[in-house]
Amino acid sequence: MKVYSIGLFKVVPGNKPVLLNIVYELSSFGFFQRGSVKEVSLFVSRETVGRTNVGERVSMEHTQTQKVCHTTVDSKGLGCSVLTDSEYPGRVAHTLIRICLEEFYKVHPESEWRGLQSDVELQTPALDQLLLKYQNPETADPMMNLQKNLDETITIVKKTVEQLGQRGEKLDDLAAKSDDLSFQSKAFMNNAERMNKCCGYV
């Protein structure tokens, strides 16, 4: 999973978005490829953010580049794009966008960029740090780590149930022998199984 660039733009509907700042992480590309990759990244980011409506969160896959451009534009016309590979989680990319917008406003009030008509480079030191931090979404985003732990737990439970079946034991047989289940619970399980079979035939 990779984040290739973070871009900030002034977006006015009907006009070409004005670049305010963009940072790149292109270490996975060869030295001679990086210039072209930067140009393509800027092009994809600008085109996608320019087609994003105010308040929308967009994740657009670009088949030619095999990248996903995640964008949003806030009510003041400040747009942010995060260009990632296709494996990068969209929710984490949009969390990164929100943080980038906040960091940009801390150092560049709206009055500083609102009147700009051509591309500039308004330095925002936090963008470089965020670009590096979010290369690993699991460590950067606590929810991602929680989701990973939950997925691992579900996998363990599935494996445990599959292993029971591999030993030739059916869950029904184990339930029938169990002292943990009352007569009513055993009857409920049998009834539920019959109902599921019945529904399966419909």
Curated annotation (Swiss-Prot):
A Pfam cross-reference name: Synaptobrevin
Keywords, comma-separated and alphabetical: Coiled coil, Cytoplasm, Cytoplasmic vesicle, Endosome, ER-Golgi transport, Golgi apparatus, Lipoprotein, Membrane, Methylation, Palmitate, Prenylation, Protein transport, Transferase, Transport
GO biological process entries: endoplasmic reticulum to Golgi vesicle-mediated transport; hypotonic response; protein transport
Domain of life: Eukaryota
Compartment(s) where it occurs, according to its Swiss-Prot or TrEMBL record: Cytoplasm, Cytosol; Cytoplasmic vesicle membrane; Golgi apparatus membrane; Cytoplasmic vesicle, Phagosome membrane
SMART domains named among the record's database cross-references: Longin
v-SNARE coiled-coil homology domain: residues covered: 142-202
GO MF annotations, alphabetized: SNAP receptor activity; transferase activity
Assembly description: May be found in 2 different SNARE complexes.
Family recorded in the similarity comment: Belongs to the synaptobrevin family.
Protein's UniProt name: Putative synaptobrevin homolog YKT6
Species whose genome carries this gene: Dictyostelium discoideum
Highest classification ranks of the organism: Eukaryota, Amoebozoa, Evosea, Eumycetozoa, Dictyostelia
Gene it is expressed from: ykt6
